């Protein structure tokens, strides 16, 4: 991190901050999840989203049913509606979310800037058990290195 620090202009907490930094010319490159690309390109249309050949990391939205849910049948209907082909396609188009339902087919234009197709096939998953076990140390190291 010490070697990277001189090249880090600042960090951001929401994609609109990043969009503003691109728009103002404050930055020229950033690490960003695909769902934020449309927001950034809305502010700075010359920005290009690139996924390295080595792949990207899949970032999942989840829908969960609590173990003690009182109306599990309705909850399962909600989950099924949420992952339906129709719902997933609509969210892919309107929210720039890569579909999890493999029955969803997107045109080349609709698939642009999404973890979909060949990009999704080479996406890696995050080991949250490992991350959570290291997180406190990483945050401490980040704060000592980057925030000094």
Residue spans of the language-model regions?
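Extracytoplasmic/secreted proteins, especially bacterial periplasmic and envelope-associated proteins
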Residues: 3, 13, 17, 21, ...
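Mature extracytoplasmic/periplasmic domains
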Residues: 57, 66-123
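Sec/Tat-exported extracytoplasmic proteins
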Residues: 4-8, 12, 26, 41, ...
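Periplasmic-binding protein-like
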Residues: 1-4, 44-67
């Amino acid at each position: 991190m010490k070697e990277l620090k001189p090249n880090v202009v600042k960090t951001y907490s929401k994609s609109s901050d990043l969009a503003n930094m691109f728009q103002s010319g404050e930055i020229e490159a950033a690490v960003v999840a695909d769902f934020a690309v449309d927001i950034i390109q809305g502010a700075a249309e010359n920005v290009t989203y690139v996924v390295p050949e080595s792949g990207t990391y899949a970032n999942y939205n989840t829908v969960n049913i609590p173990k003690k849910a009182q109306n599990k049948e309705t909850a399962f209907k909600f989950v099924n509606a949420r992952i339906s082909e129709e719902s997933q396609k609509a969210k892919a188009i309107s929210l720039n979310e890569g579909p999890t339902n493999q029955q969803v087919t997107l045109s080349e234009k609709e698939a642009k800037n999404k973890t979909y197709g060949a990009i999704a096939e080479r996406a890696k998953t995050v080991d949250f058990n490992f991350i959570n076990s290291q997180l406190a140390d990483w945050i401490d190291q980040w704060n000592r290195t980057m925030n000094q």
